[in-house]
Amino acid sequence: MGGEAGCAAAVGAEGRVKSLGLVFEDERKGCYSSGETVAGHVLLEASEPVALRALRLEAQGRATAAWGPSTCPRASASTAALAVFSEVEYLNVRLSLREPPAGEGIILLQPGKHEFPFRFQLPSEPLVTSFTGKYGSIQYCVRAVLERPKVPDQSVKRELQVVSHVDVNTPALLTPVLKTQEKMVGCWFFTSGPVSLSAKIERKGYCNGEAIPIYAEIENCSSRLIVPKAAIFQTQTYLASGKTKTIRHMVANVRGNHIASGSTDTWNGKTLKIPPVTPSILDCCIIRVDYSLAVYIHIPGAKKLMLELPLVIGTIPYNGFGSRNSSIASQFSMDMSWLTLTLPEQPEAPPNYADVVSEEEFSRHIPPYPQPPNCEGEVCCPVFACIQEFRFQPPPLYSEVDPHPSDVEESQPVSFIL
């Protein structure tokens, strides 16, 4: 973890503890993965002799999804029952760093600086990638707690970034994706002709910073002037108490040239670069982060013609061979810029006269997911690890729009599993 070490000022009754801090062994390490060792020191500085009962270290990790009245500080007891909440635990470690000998109640630390080393191993089972969203989060932290007689406990906490690696070199993510669709422009007997669209990407899995080559063929047999466009969309889905919340937003886009009536256009690898975004999260039973590449055509006075191609944002880059020994790729250094950067909203270019007609909203749909196994009280088994360079850098600075604003849809039980 980069950055300054965690530090907490003393609040003891006599001010004997000047500071309590926590540092990791490798402060430059951006993130941790399943099975790795976390090591460091707890630092304590005392100005006078300090009596303590124990010094312990706690490491915790959990996913939570919640919304409703009780998530607001001003919620009353009568409205608290309306809130929805779900939680899944992934990490729970507790270590004793210092405790009194058997038969003794306290330890006396002499004035000065003290260091207490710690070391523990993360579970070998896949951990879900760290993430923070509007209706939930997946967070891991390490906390040192100093227990003292007659005064409140003192503690210091550090956040631990975790990534569940997704290798885009797996066969499923190397498969090309192709879709075709046609739309008749006009209505009833006043049709002006069809508009057809075919779009293809060479593989399903990409990583942050990669440029996706888009291959498309557009034929305009209508009387309208049309505009082809492409965009990457992120969809966050939260599940709590059998209800769902979904947020969908554009994270990158590109636009093509106008296509006149009776003309065609071809994209021979038109590129769309993936900005720093959190990797796909597909192995958590209460929070899911999906991506799709939409290739669509704006038709004045009509609904868009749109193709959505599934996309997985991974963490282990494409090696060009689809090698079976893809574990070697995990040794590659990753661009972790999404841990700190905020992604600006990327507006489309100013509209021309063909765009003046107001565009209807994209149809929003979440594929139905069958009911997953019961996750209460146990770690969810990862279904399909797919992920690259990330922390949820807080999701990009986009305009958050909840596509399900009413409570009606929330009452429908929905679950997801790959």
Swiss-Prot record:
Task: For the motif PPxY motif 1, give the residue ranges.
Answer: 350-353
Tagged with keyword Secreted? no
Does Zinc show up as a keyword for this record? no
User: One Pfam family this chain carries?
Assistant: Arrestin_N
Q: What cellular component GO annotations does this protein have?
A: cytoplasm; early endosome; endosome; extracellular vesicle; intracellular membrane-bounded organelle; plasma membrane
Q: Which GO terms describe its biological process?
A: extracellular vesicle biogenesis; positive regulation of interferon-beta production; positive regulation of ubiquitin-protein transferase activity; protein K63-linked ubiquitination; protein transport; protein ubiquitination
Q: What does this protein do?
A: Functions as an adapter recruiting ubiquitin-protein ligases to their specific substrates. Plays a role in endocytosis of activated G protein-coupled receptors (GPCRs). Through an ubiquitination-dependent mechanism also plays a role in the incorporation of SLC11A2 into extracellular vesicles. May play a role in glucose uptake. Participates in innate immune response by promoting IFIH1/MDA5 activation through interaction with TRIM65.
Under what name is this protein listed? Arrestin domain-containing protein 4
* Gene coding for it: ARRDC4
